[in-house]
């Protein structure tokens, strides 16, 4: 497997798909690295992993304890994970000296990989080397994807508030006064005679002016309501659904093997997921 098909473990965290800060996840970055006889050789700076599964394939080790300014890639099967660091029990100073120097700005080429294999393999067969080199250490925790949801603000809309005129018919009762003529007639009972008067002569006419009130209509604007506009934040819960993955161990047991529960497995090959 070439580096082209592997990515750095730190890049998984940058993609926010894997939570490397979770205590249930194993993150070797920053762990102390020890070589043969428990000699401290430096620090694990990073790891190369399969992007699809997150499985570690190489530890990127800064071997400053043996050689200044040199980083090498050590297959995961050569590491033994402990609370105090990662132990490469069979890794010697001479091997590290002959291994290819890894630089972040260059690919881990097939030539470099072959060189490191020859150095680490020694007298082992190629099959034995590959079986060991990429075998998961006894304690290597698995990565699990978890949803990381961020929030950003955007303009959801706008509200425009103005005024318009609406009309309605309004009826008001107004009391109005007017004058009317009152004619009073009184009968004369003493029958006085009018001397020299001839009927029809001296015709007289009386004129009376009448007054009346009329309604004068006008309109006046009054303040009936005041409107103030502001904003307030309301919180609503939105459910987000996405597919996430996690690593599971494929345990292959061959022959007469006992599990931690003490159950004997006698089938030739038994495979189960944990």
Swiss-Prot record:
Region (Disordered) location: 253-274
Cysteine pairings via disulfide bonds: none
Domain of life: Bacteria
Any GO MF annotation of the entry: electron transporter, transferring electrons within the cyclic electron transport pathway of photosynthesis activity
SUPFAM superfamilies documented for this protein: PRC-barrel domain (SSF50346)
GO BP term (any one): photosynthesis, light reaction
Assigned GO CC terms: plasma membrane light-harvesting complex
Listed PANTHER family: STRESS RESPONSE PROTEIN YSNF (PTHR38463:SF1)
NCBIfam families for the chain: YsnF/AvaK domain (TIGR02271)
Official protein name in the record: Uncharacterized protein DR_1314
Organism the protein comes from: Deinococcus radiodurans (strain ATCC 13939 / DSM 20539 / JCM 16871 / CCUG 27074 / LMG 4051 / NBRC 15346 / NCIMB 9279 / VKM B-1422 / R1)
């Amino acid at each position: 497997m070439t580096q082209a098909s592997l990515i750095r473990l730190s890049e998984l965290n940058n993609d926010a798909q894997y939570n490397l800060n979770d205590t249930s996840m194993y993150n070797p970055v920053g762990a102390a690295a020890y070589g043969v006889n428990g000699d401290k050789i430096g620090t694990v700076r990073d790891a190369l992993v399969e992007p699809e599964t997150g499985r570690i394939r190489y530890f990127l080790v800064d071997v400053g304890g043996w050689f200044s300014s040199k980083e090498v890639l050590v297959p995961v099967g050569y590491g033994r994970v402990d609370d105090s660091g990662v132990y490469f029990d069979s890794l010697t100073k001479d091997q590290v000296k002959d291994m290819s120097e890894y630089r972040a700005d260059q690919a881990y080429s097939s030539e470099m990989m072959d060189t490191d294999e020859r150095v680490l393999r020694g007298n082992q067969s190629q099959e034995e080397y590959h079986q060991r080199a990429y075998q998961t250490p006894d304690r290597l925790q698995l990565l699990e994807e978890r949803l990381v949801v961020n929030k950003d603000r955007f303009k959801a809309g706008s509200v425009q508030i103005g005024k318009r005129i609406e009309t309605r018919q309004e009826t008001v009762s107004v009391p109005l006064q007017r004058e009317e003529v009152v004619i009073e007639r009184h009968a004369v009972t003493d029958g006085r005679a009018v001397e020299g008067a001839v009927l029809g002569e001296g015709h007289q006419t009386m004129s009376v002016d009448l007054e009346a009130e009329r309604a004068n209509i006008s309109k006046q604007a009054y303040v009936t309501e005041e409107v103030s506009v502001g904003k307030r934040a309301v919180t609503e819960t939105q459910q987000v659904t996405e597919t996430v993955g996690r690593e599971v161990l494929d345990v292959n047991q061959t022959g007469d093997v006992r599990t931690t529960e003490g159950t004997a497995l006698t089938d030739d090959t038994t495979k189960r997921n944990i």
